[in-house]
Amino acid sequence: MKRAKQPTWTLSVGEWANATGNVLSLCHPDWRGVREAAYSHQGPVLETHDAAEDSAGIIEAMKQASLSVLVVQGFPPGSSELLRSAQRGGLSTRVVLHSSMAQHGTDPGESEVADTVMRLAAEGVINKVGFVKKGQAEAFTALGHTAHYVPNGVPELAPFEPLALGDDGLQVGIFAEPLWRKNVTTQLGAIALLAPARAHLMTMPTNTYLSDLEVVEHGELPYAEFVRLQGSVDLNLNVSLSECHPMSPLESYLAGVPCLMSRTSDLFKSDAQLWELTTVGEADNPSAIAAAATALVAKRHEAVDRAQHWMTSFDPIAKSLWEDFVS
């Protein structure tokens, strides 16, 4: 991962001073879901590629702006150094992890981050640790590492004009990198069963047996362009093998587009009908995904209405859990 040579702060000290409250969230500008999660909590956010690059300057700026709580979202490079600086500076510190235990067991990078965070918490460098994935905080606490459930808030979408993607078949978005847990290849297999359909992707997997599919590869898009594209398709697929509290499905439903998910997060689970309509149990079965997608598209208006109602009900819960976490 390349590190920026110069600080990449997106907020000035003056803007921080205008903030209500005493909390500053920090995130990596290129980690899209984590970034949107940070902004979902409404407070000031600092984006940086390397949290250690000017840690002393960040801490001093926070003090000048009367921001006394630092929340690191997703643990960007340099977070350990920044958190130690914050501790020395008398600030209260928090870390929110957006990974799952499944990732900790298979991804060396995520494993190292989780172990580092728990070690820093044991040393008193981090005052509270949170997980956006429901069920993990209880497990870590049982293992001797006190943790809290801190789900993401509901994002806010700016108005946009939908793109004209064509009316010659179902336009389906799979906006995830082809990593093992994102399950992109399986979902492309499902799209073959939805024909006529066109897939819209970030990056096409290298499997040559997929070459007959109609695919548009869009690459990594700026956030506003991504939201516009995601909100212009007929259906989005987010059928991953491991998930935490994904933001893309929420953005999709806010834009009026149904999104099929796996049952690896607790999104919509409190509404049994919505859960049944918007999720699929067999995440590694393209036929099951295609069948669930067909059923979802047939009831897209009901799904969108129920999802938006769910978000309206859930957001105060997320806000309350966040306030408890940062207090």
PLM region spans:
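Active-site proximal beta-strand in glycosyltransferases
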Residues: 69-71, 86-105
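Membrane-proximal helix-turn-helix segments that form the acceptor-binding/catalytic region
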Residues: 109-128
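A charged, aromatic-enriched C-terminal amphipathic alpha-helix characteristic of glycosyltransferases
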Residues: 283-287, 297-327
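Acidic anion/phosphate-binding donor-loop and adjacent secondary structure
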Residues: 105-106, 141, 149-169
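N-terminal pre-catalytic "stem/leader" segment of glycosyltransferase-like enzymes
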Residues: 1-82
